[in-house]
Amino acid sequence: MAAKIRRNDEVIVLTGKDKGKKGKITKVLATGKVIVEGINLVKKHQKPVPAMGVQGGIVEQEAAIDVSNVAIFNAETGKADRVGFRFEDDKKVRFFKSNSVTIK
């Protein structure tokens, strides 16, 4: 099955503490989760590893969000949108369901 949300897509968070925030997807996980740039930040307690030159301390990093909690952002309408698939020139492409514009 083709992925409706892919890496480098601009998405908007639908639920949770970061509801309404926009960001770019940096990674799509096989478990049905995505990591969005600057969203769902958590603090991780990092142990120092002198052999690798890693300094210890409290580090902020992005945690995964379930795919169902984000929606692709349509810049033309300024809202979250749903994604459909169609064939153009024998290629399967994604498009926004609200205005039928092809997603690049």
From Swiss-Prot:
<dbReference type="Pfam" id="PF00467">
    <property type="entry name" value="KOW"/>
</dbReference>
<dbReference type="GO" id="GO:0005840">
    <property type="term" value="C:ribosome"/>
</dbReference>
<comment type="subunit">
    <text>Part of the 50S ribosomal subunit.</text>
</comment>
<keyword id="KW-0687">Ribonucleoprotein</keyword>
<dbReference type="InterPro" id="IPR005825">
    <property type="entry name" value="Ribosomal_uL24_CS"/>
</dbReference>
<keyword id="KW-0689">Ribosomal protein</keyword>
<dbReference type="Pfam" id="PF17136">
    <property type="entry name" value="ribosomal_L24"/>
</dbReference>
<dbReference type="InterPro" id="IPR014722">
    <property type="entry name" value="Rib_uL2_dom2"/>
</dbReference>
<comment type="function">
    <text>One of the proteins that surrounds the polypeptide exit tunnel on the outside of the subunit.</text>
</comment>
<dbReference type="GO" id="GO:1990904">
    <property type="term" value="C:ribonucleoprotein complex"/>
</dbReference>
<protein>
    <recommendedName>
        <fullName>Large ribosomal subunit protein uL24</fullName>
    </recommendedName>
</protein>
<comment type="function">
    <text>One of two assembly initiator proteins, it binds directly to the 5'-end of the 23S rRNA, where it nucleates assembly of the 50S subunit.</text>
</comment>
<keyword id="KW-0699">rRNA-binding</keyword>
<dbReference type="GO" id="GO:0006412">
    <property type="term" value="P:translation"/>
</dbReference>
<dbReference type="InterPro" id="IPR008991">
    <property type="entry name" value="Translation_prot_SH3-like_sf"/>
</dbReference>
<dbReference type="GO" id="GO:0019843">
    <property type="term" value="F:rRNA binding"/>
</dbReference>
<dbReference type="GO" id="GO:0003735">
    <property type="term" value="F:structural constituent of ribosome"/>
</dbReference>
<comment type="similarity">
    <text>Belongs to the universal ribosomal protein uL24 family.</text>
</comment>
<dbReference type="InterPro" id="IPR041988">
    <property type="entry name" value="Ribosomal_uL24_KOW"/>
</dbReference>
<keyword id="KW-0694">RNA-binding</keyword>
<dbReference type="InterPro" id="IPR005824">
    <property type="entry name" value="KOW"/>
</dbReference>
<dbReference type="InterPro" id="IPR003256">
    <property type="entry name" value="Ribosomal_uL24"/>
</dbReference>
